[in-house]
Amino acid sequence: MFQKRVDQVITKMKADGLKQILVSEPCSIYYLTGVDVGPGERLFALYLNDEGRKVLFLNTLFTVEQKDCEEIWFSDTDDSTSLLASVINSSETLGVDKDWTARFLIPLMEKCEGLKVVLGSKYVDDTRAIKDEKEIECMIENSQINDVVMERTRDFIKEGMTEKQVEAFILEQYKLLGCQDVSFSPICSFGANGADPHHMPDDSVLNAGESIVIDIGGRKDRYCSDMTRTYFCKEASDEYKKIHDIVRVANEKAEEIIRPGVRLCDIDLTARNYISSFGYGEYFTHRLGHFIGQTDHEFGDVSSTNTETVKPGMIFSIEPGIYLPEKMGVRVEDLVLVTEDGCIVLNKLDKKYAMIG
């Protein structure tokens, strides 16, 4: 499995004429080698070249099983970038990760005189974007768990509760259902707090008539889930009901057009234009979706500027929203898996307007 992924990355490198890359993102290194390390501030990198050479750079602080690649170990007192430089071909362009820290990159460039550096993340990112069978199984299972957590949360919420109480309940459910962690800190927003798409739970108390935005995800077997539902406490104004219906239909219209060959920007615009047709376009303040896998936000998005086309095996979110400042917010989010002729919506929990509490 790991060698197949490495081969796919090298094939992409060769197509662009790039002979070497340095992978430094821990999730990407795990994806290519099976080595799971949280390096903190220490160097952790995988060197790949177009001839199939694989060299893993590891601090002796970490204990890992031997893998199918060369290993170069170093201690905290060693000059780790000199060890990197000993492997890199300074006469050839080197691709590096988009987020690699300057504390390693700059010393490496100083040691490799004349080395040309380019962004090399896309070779791994594009490979990670197409999920294999095992990854898909994990993400389907995790989305099923997420549906259960959302349903339990919906049934738990009552008028007079605080956002923090709901957050604590959500965290406990993931533990009970076997998740090792959450994909991200749960978002639980009552009333006007819902106008902030990334509001963090506080001591706000739920009152009748308020919107309730719940955005949650769990992490199990390294893979993430993510979904959002919006409910209303006991009652809602006609305007709020209308807004919820607009957002829900925008979500469904976007999902309906997803199939291989469709541009990601056109998926975004399908939802965005529908919302705009009701006069709420300025209140849809973010892109339609993001890719997801080992991390909640992997490289790739569903935005009005992304002209890349959809491919089978991609998994991403569809999450339109309308946010009225100082009043309320509504967001409806599913994960979708692209198939050979369409897509499968991984979240099955009802997303129609509902009153709770």
Task: Name every feature range the model reports, one short phrase each.
Residues 1-357:
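Active-site neighborhoods and metal-handling regions in enzymes and metal-associated proteins
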